[in-house]
Amino acid sequence: MNNGILHQNYNSKKFDIIKISLASPEVIRSWSHGEVKKPETINYRTFKPERDGLFCAKIFGPIKDYECLCGKYKRLKHRGVVCERCGVEVEQAKVRRERMGHIDLVCPVVHIWYLKSLPSRIGLFLDMPLKNVEKVLYFESYIVTDPGMTPLEKKQLLTDEEYAEALENYGYEFEASMGAEAIRDLLADTDIESEIELLQAECEESKSTAKKEKAIKRLRLLETFQASGNKPEWMVMTVLPVLPPDLRPLVPIEGGRFATSDLNDLYRRVINRNNRLKKLLDLNAPDIIVRNEKRMLQEAVDALLDNGRRGRAVTGSNKRPLKSLADMIKGKQGRFRQNLLGKRVDYSGRSVITVGPSLRLHECGLPKKMALELFKPFVYSKLRLGGHATTIKQAKRMVELEEAVVWDILETVINEHPVLLNRAPTLHRLGIQAFEPRLIEGKAIQLHPLVCAAFNADFDGDQMAVHVPLTVESQLEARVLMMSTNNILSPASGQPIITPTQDIVLGLYYITREKEGARGEGKLFSSYEDVSRAYNSGTIDIHAKIKLRIDRQVFDTKGNTYNEKGVVNTTVGRALLLNILPEGLSFSLLNKVLVKKEISKIINQAFRVLGGKATVVLADKLMYAGFKYSTLSGVSVGVDDMTIPDNKEAKIEEAEKEIKQITEQYQSSLITENERYNNIINIWSKTSDEVGASMMDAISKDTVSINGEKKEIESFNSVYMMAKSGARGSYNQMRQLAGMRGLMAKPDGTMIETAITANFREGLSVLQYFTSTHGARKGLADTALKTANAGYLTRRLVDVAQDLVVIEEDCGTDDGLMFSAIVEDGEVKVPLVERALGRTLAADVVTEKGVVLLEAGTLLDENLVELLDDNGIDMIKVRSPITCKTRRGLCAKCYGRDLARERQVNVGESVGVIAAQSIGEPGTQLTMRTFHTGGAASLGITVSDIKVKTAGKIKFKNIRTVTNKEGQEIVISRAGEIIVSDTMGRVREQHKIPMGAVVPLASGKAVEIGDVIATWDPHAQPLITDVAGKVVLEDVIDGITSKHTYDDLTGQQTIEITSISQRTTSKNLKPVVKIVDEKGAKLKSIPLAVGAVLNVADDSILEVGDIVAKIPLEGSKNKDITGGLPRVAELFEARRPKDAAILSPCDGMVRLGNRDTKEKQRIEIIDKNGHIVEEILLPKSRHLVVFDGEQVSRGDVLADGPTDPHDLLKYKGLEEFADYILIEAQSVYRMQGVVINDKHIETIVRQMLRKAVILDEGDSKFVKDESIELVRILEENDKLRKQGKKEVEYELVLMGITRSSLSTESFLSAASFQETTRVLTEASINSQIDNLRGLKENVLIGRLIPTGTGLAVRKESAKIEKMREELGVEDNMVFTDLSSFNPEEISFDSIQSQKEDKDINEDIEESLRNALESLDF
């Protein structure tokens, strides 16, 4: 393969594109510096390379710098001389890393990638099956290359016997041969143009889709060859390039042996076989021997290029497969991922971390020894500049001896020189942050406790790495962008990430608690100082309730100021905290018991009102106070803190009695095995909860006597305080310590029915211990698997989104998504206020009275979203990354607010990577388990009615009802909802109403809290008729499609429909209830699903609203719900679920029962005129949810099942699809309590919609039904529009993140992701060009990435390049546009003086200035 870079000047970094294509033999020879003729490597006695061998110095260059092999010419002065004795050019030794050689192959050899990488390019080009091509290649069959006048066909295969027979019959009128020569001749003889014409004709005429698809594939391949300038015969090699020797080294190890790269073995085999073949041909050896040797040469080259791709892999002496050229570049250890995307860095160290409770937020403690090693160069230069040392050598000695002056200089060097701390795994950008180092004794790095959450660090032996930014530019970026004080908010959710945890929370909770009857209760103080004095002198207790006079200024988020004055009721502890509360925040924030949530609120409020700097100071002070008081409190865990409730034994006895009853009922066959199991699980979980509740009662209350009176007060029990404050532990853990452990899960998620009645304080018996090992080990195994899976998900997400950067301010679209509150189980889970915050409006917000409240294009901040809430707005249209019209990037308006910075996102922000990190990072917190509905997990009470939780009005949505003979309104629609709005008209509840529910109130009626608005049978779904008439049962035959059961106890008869799989005969019968009028004309037919129990008999008369049959809901409830990480991966991979719901492809009327086949049922959709518009064939086992004659709209569900996102996009449109992915993904995260902003998920969805399928090619070169990048279609349409031609029509197609990553425009990005061989094979045939637009491609070639400061540099250099062209300036003239400079803003002189070479690149200077302007620094 020929990389376009190679012909450029080696030092040049100034290339804009990289092109990859097939290399012709001439190109390979032009790279080469000589032919490798011998398989020898180096002489075992002299250790010098053999001439013409694999390490030959004449071909590849000298071994030592500027010295020829025989030693005649040495030193720099002979540079460029070719020694006449040994033929070596006097040059630097590093040319041995660059100079290639070549091997002239005696016979052509096929490149295995183009043969075996599927689809086989050679097979496709020649229109031959891969098997046949291989038969010819490996000398099993002849192939006819020119049939002449004989009846043989071109490309026909002949065995040896057939070939001999043909020779006898036709003599030499035809040509047939075998091996790579034959393939090469066929490739070279193909007339590409005429083949293309033939294929185009075939595409248009062909009726069969399979043929058409194959023709399109082949047409595409031929077209690429035609367009790319590659010749097909170049897929067969006649010259083999040889890698430079320093890239496949041979190093002597002790004992006179050599360690060598596997490539040398592989090259040796090729050279040996090539030379042997040359000899055999010179000797005119028999054909069979030559053939065998040619085959062996082909196999040797195959092994060198891609070992193991065909047949068994060639192994070395230790039975290990040899590493071929392909293995060198692919996989985690390959060139791409090991050396280009992940490099090791200098000036770094790592050590264990310990806690640094006295540090400030922007500091870290760095061990002196480590700092000295890291900052050595700076120390050396300072020692010289300060006159302490005259040479570097002397400075080095001083540092080694650790003289006193060295430590002083180290102090000055590290002053204000930030270092980067990183903790692996770096799952999001907060995994690397900058700190100012503080020198400490010891060997461990000290870390500030508040940043632990961001690093996910704890101090149980975690290690962290330190990196030193060297250049001034990098120090500046570290300080402005990466300093821990500039990363207060999480980029995933916009919530503070430096909130106190554990001990700090416990300390703050402890001192803000109040205690009845404490010393000094009821006293009045005039100021904080008075309280402090009284507390320190011991006259008042820290928990005493007191009165305090305050006088403070308070700011709100809108910037208004008001005074907070007067006497407040508080406690001593809260008054002591008043000192750390900054001016501008209300005392009411502190004047309560501070649990974790409340502390988080204080920090949040401080950030909103006072800004970053004040927040950092406050966070530090809160931390110091928390640590101080948690130490003073003396809270710790003792055995007596766990109080076992008195009624525990009684409760357990009661449970055991109930279980005994249930077991007896089961034994006398009154209940099923399933019911027995579920009941037992229910009893134990109820008992366990009750014991837990009484334990909490006991632990959470203390009885004290105040002035002789007994009073119950909240307990000061240590365990209770830890859990209550949110510092450590949970109710569930406390229940296991002092209540009962309860039910344990098996690894598959089901519950073990023998509960553990003991708790940890009493201790477990051997059996109980054994029972609990089950679940515990599952947990550990899960965690290990989960980490790897979450990491892989993150990697796929980053790969798909890496090139998505904000590249412009506004794309000008008015498209967007409709946002409303997210409602689950009737409750508002996420209010609109939260979803809308930080988004840009796509349309005006209008109140009910028609007043424009907010105009389109407004960025919604905290104050504006409150305005929405106050005016009862429950739906708005916001701009979204999914609908952004910017090409190859995003615009700032569609993205909205940068969550970590609280203002509109900057141009140049790499939002794609941030989105991927935000979704991937919590992945490790998600569960791996799939949840089972059933077992104790969700056996709550079965819901059979809906009670209103808020007073207001109800409104029906998509609900159709009929009135039955009792006068009740019965719902007959499927996807109906009842919406409850409050007096302001805001949606407060939303409830899904099942078919068959009774609704007592009409739409628009007022309701009070607790009113019932719907009731239904929770155990069965009824089929209800909306017409009156006589029943005719069709295909309901006892013993075949249905079974009669007679209940002895109740005397009831039931008819139940049986499943098709249970029938031996008559599989095409379809049980149906027909309703006919007096004349026998059909009014309605209702298909009966498997398991349906009939409520009517043949010939019975039905009224409107009567129940025809009931489908028991037992069976449908026990399907597994995929949860956790696998569900997120499933969504982003856009997998089609098994037995997905079938959606209607168009509007029309459903017609069933026509022309059903043996296995399948046919659904026809007909238009008004009775013409069939669409037909769908389904297995008979699928249950339809539509009736014959029902009207459906495009996208309505015809057969139920899980949603297929592809169909949703196709039939319901982009908005419904986006909504579905957002809600589904968010619900998984919400279950784990993880907050992720919607826009991150939208950003990934945008990348999943990068391709579109052509519906009508218009006047373009595209082919119908082909899928192409959306950007290319839009660009083509622009051209066509300008020329006044017909544009391309297309529709979006959905691709999973893996497929989307592999089909990006950049082949470098795709190759470094997965399936490297396939990607490179395809790219080289297409002569693909990589425009180096994404982040990954630029990292690979070692440049600034085009985001942030890199984007500014890129824009600047593009501007300069343009000016150069206009002015005709040559490359060596320095030229910068300084017109936009404003030297007053920043004085760069101070920076210049620190840099020895004064010439700072001006465009970097400009970009840094832009960066500084965009951050309020």
Swiss-Prot record:
Catalytic activity: RNA(n) + a ribonucleoside 5'-triphosphate = RNA(n+1) + diphosphate
Residues that bind Zn(2+) 1: 68, 70, 83, 86
Binding of Mg(2+), residues: 458, 460, 462
Assembly information from the UniProt record: The RNAP catalytic core consists of 2 alpha, 1 beta, 1 beta' and 1 omega subunit. When a sigma factor is associated with the core the holoenzyme is formed, which can initiate transcription.
Stated role: DNA-dependent RNA polymerase catalyzes the transcription of DNA into RNA using the four ribonucleoside triphosphates as substrates.
Gene Ontology molecular functions: DNA binding; DNA-directed RNA polymerase activity; magnesium ion binding; zinc ion binding
Record EC number: 2.7.7.6
Binding site for Zn(2+) 2: 811, 884, 891, 894
CDD domains linked to this entry: RNAP_beta'_C, RNAP_beta'_N
HAMAP family, A to Z: RNApol_bact_RpoC
Protein name (database record): DNA-directed RNA polymerase subunit beta'
Family: Belongs to the RNA polymerase beta' chain family.
Alphabetical keyword list: DNA-directed RNA polymerase, Magnesium, Metal-binding, Nucleotidyltransferase, Transcription, Transferase, Zinc
A Gene Ontology biological process term: DNA-templated transcription
Manner of cofactor binding, per the entry note: Binds 1 Mg(2+) ion per subunit.
Pfam family, one: RNA_pol_Rpb1_3
Cofactors that this protein relies on: Mg(2+); Zn(2+)
One Gene Ontology cellular component: DNA-directed RNA polymerase complex
Matches recorded under InterPro entries: DNA-dir_RpoC_beta_prime, DNA-dir_RpoC_beta_prime_bact, RNA_pol_asu, RNA_pol_N, RNA_pol_Rpb1_1, RNA_pol_Rpb1_3, RNA_pol_Rpb1_3_sf, RNA_pol_Rpb1_4
Disulfide bridges in this chain: none
